[in-house]
Amino acid sequence: MRHGKFGLIGHPIGHSLSPALFKAGYEGRYPYELIETADFEEAYMRFLEGYDGINVTAPFKELAYVKADILSEECKAIGATNLLVKTPEGVKAYNSDYLGVKMWLNEVYAEMPESNSDATEKEVSVLIVGTGGAGKAAAAAAESLGMRVTRMNRTVRDEMTRPLEDFRE
């Protein structure tokens, strides 16, 4: 892999552990910077002008989804992204929140008493707190495993009353 430049966009992000995780994961081989601004368009332009990939956090996950040229299947199901990568075909969006939550739910379910297989075998109910990009990813992951999902948020948002399938459009 060629040497690239990577970063994180969102606001606020000064508290983020992403730089330390990225540095540890790639043993410091690639630069990773915080692009902190409340203006999504400014952050996105900085990505286009000087970065190969960026992690995306609140409040930009849904805005970044709209900007992507290519969407992973997870992103299409959720309507949000937490990772943008430049490719020869354009900017591709991924959602590792979805993949991580799905793996975790399967792992936790397998450890539950009277469970001898993955989470798709029995009815399980989960509560998702939050309806932003990460909450949507968690709900989609749980629903993909056949779990019954209840969503809760501190403020009422119109999309809370819509079935998750509507977000796939």
Regions found by a protein language model. Give the residues of each.
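Phosphate/diphosphate ligand-binding glycine-rich loop within oxidoreductases
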Residues: R2-E111
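Glycine-rich adenosine-cofactor-binding loop
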Residues: G10, K92-Y98, L105, Y109, ...
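Short phosphate-engaging motifs
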Residues: F60-L63, A134, D158
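Anionic-ligand binding region
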Residues: L145-E169
